[in-house]
Amino acid sequence: MIPLQHGLILAAVLFVLGFTCLVLRRNLLFMLIGLEIMINSAALAFVVGGSYWGQTDGQIMYILAISLAAAEASIGLALLLQLHRHRQNLNIDTVSEMRG
């Protein structure tokens, strides 16, 4: 069995990597990937904690996090396609430009 500290450290490293990708990248696709990494790292922390204490709550939260990630990915990819159709660009800075 993997120790609790190792699993939580891995989840924290993945969360920091996802947050870094979310903050530093200006491409919407990479921002969505970073957000997915963050959601999966939180789900990993739930599973590791649940297996350490012998509870099934961590696995239930994992199922909830995966369904949340699927909904977020479908909405995000739909927005990504619309942005690419209208701007021919996935740069998030083009969205904040005002028309006129």
Swiss-Prot record:
Single GO MF descriptor: quinone binding
Compartment list: Cell inner membrane
Keywords linked to the UniProt accession: Cell inner membrane, Cell membrane, Membrane, NAD, Quinone, Translocase, Transmembrane, Transmembrane helix, Transport, Ubiquinone
Alphabetical GO biological process terms: ATP synthesis coupled electron transport
Membrane topology: Multi-pass membrane protein
Major enzyme class: translocase
Secretion signal, residue range per the UniProt entry: none
Transmembrane regions listed in the UniProt entry: 4-24, 28-48, 60-80
Matching InterPro entries: NADH_UbQ_OxRdtase_chain4L/K, NUOK/Mnh_C1-like
Recorded catalytic activity of this chain's protein: a quinone + NADH + 5 H(+)(in) = a quinol + NAD(+) + 4 H(+)(out)
Disulfide-bond pairs as recorded: none
UniProt cross-references to Pfam families, sorted A to Z: Oxidored_q2
Quaternary structure note: NDH-1 is composed of 13 different subunits. Subunits NuoA, H, J, K, L, M, N constitute the membrane sector of the complex.
Protein name, as recorded: NADH-quinone oxidoreductase subunit K
Species this protein is from: Proteus mirabilis (strain HI4320)
Upper classification of the organism: Bacteria, Pseudomonadati, Pseudomonadota, Gammaproteobacteria, Enterobacterales
